[in-house]
Amino acid sequence: AAPADKPLVYACSGCSNVAQLANQLAVELDRAGRAQMSCISGVGGGVPALVKLAQSGRPILALDGCPLACCQACLAQAGVQADQHVVLSTLAICKRNGRACTHQEQAQAAAAVDAVLHCLTPHGHLA
């Protein structure tokens, strides 16, 4: 499918394990052709081309690591609300700095994101 036919995915990329996992999952969705990843810091920073893409009306999946919901807040700055929003720390994955998520936590988060993405597109399976 052409990029315009895919949902947009935005992810937190903060310093905690769950933030980095959110970014990793978004990259995997993009590389697998399941969604088009775009730059949330550009949206939050008001970069015109990136704000325009966020406001294009395409389905949006926002992946945040923790309840601070920085990804969701950046979208709100552009007047956009995600169609689906996942906060990884609500999946019983403890937020930690200086350590990566375990393989089990990664698999758990990938399964949750896959289920949510499937609501946006029938091709939403995370590889």
Where are these regions (language model features)?
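Iron-sulfur-associated redox domains of electron-transfer enzymes in respiratory
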Residues: 1-127
